[in-house]
A protein has these predicted regions:
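Basic nucleic-acid-binding alpha-helical/helix-turn surface characteristic of O6-alkylguanine DNA
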Residues: 1-101, 147, 151-156
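Short, hydrophobic/aromatic-rich beta-strand segments within well-structured domains
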Residues: 12-16, 105-107, 118
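Histidine- and aromatic-rich ligand-binding microenvironments
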Residues: 83, 114-117, 129
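Asparagine-centered polar/low-complexity signal
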Residues: 95, 110-113
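Regulatory, non-catalytic segments
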Residues: 101-106, 110-111
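Short Lys/Arg-enriched helix C-cap and helix-to-coil transition segments
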Residues: 117-124
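…primarily DNA-binding HTH/wHTH and HhH modules…
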Residues: 128-156
Length: 156
């Protein structure tokens, strides 16, 4: 496994990869020897463009290779359908994947999304309009939603 790190407005981002991207996550510090391969630079540049408000979608999604159950992968695929600047609820996602009673399981799968920003789990909020959980905290989630045009008062 190779790793690349870069600093961003939301913190240090780590990309784990081999031939494909395995994980994109926020970390507290850079640890170990970092690589600088083409695949890393491809995603690093897209993420930085997004964080600067210059990109609304991502290219080369076929290079994402998540490890997870079929159920988790179906949830992550559904997340990719949530448009930039829009939100969805856990209930709507459960309906989208044909499992309307599986809201909690959907929430768990959303929380295990291995691809920060690229697979937009930050766009999922509670049905009542509350922000809901986020693996990297509500401040990061709010910041990502602000980039997409949400105002603080539009999210509870």
């Amino acid at each position: 496994m190779k790793y690349g790190y870069f600093k961003s407005p939301i913190g240090i981002i780590k990309i784990s990869y081999e031939e494909n991207i395995k994980k994109i996550e926020l970390v507290d510090e850079i640890s170990g020897k970092a690589s600088n391969d083409k695949i890393l630079l491809l995603f690093k540049n897209q993420i930085l463009e997004y964080l600067a408000g210059e990109r609304k979608s991502f290219d080369h999604l076929e290079l994402l290779n998540p490890e997870g159950t079929d159920f988790q992968k179906s949830v992550w695929q559904a997340l990719l359908k949530i448009p930039y600047g829009k939100t969805s609820s856990y209930k709507e996602l459960a309906n989208e994947i044909g499992k309307p009673k599986a809201m909690r399981a959907v929430g768990t799968a959303v929380g295990k999304n291995p691809f920060l920003i690229i697979v937009p789990c930050h766009r999922v909020i509670k049905s009542d309009g509350n922000l809901g959980g986020f693996a990297y905290g509500s401040k990061v989630k709010r910041n990502l939603l602000k980039i997409e045009g949400f105002k603080n008062q539009s999210i509870k």
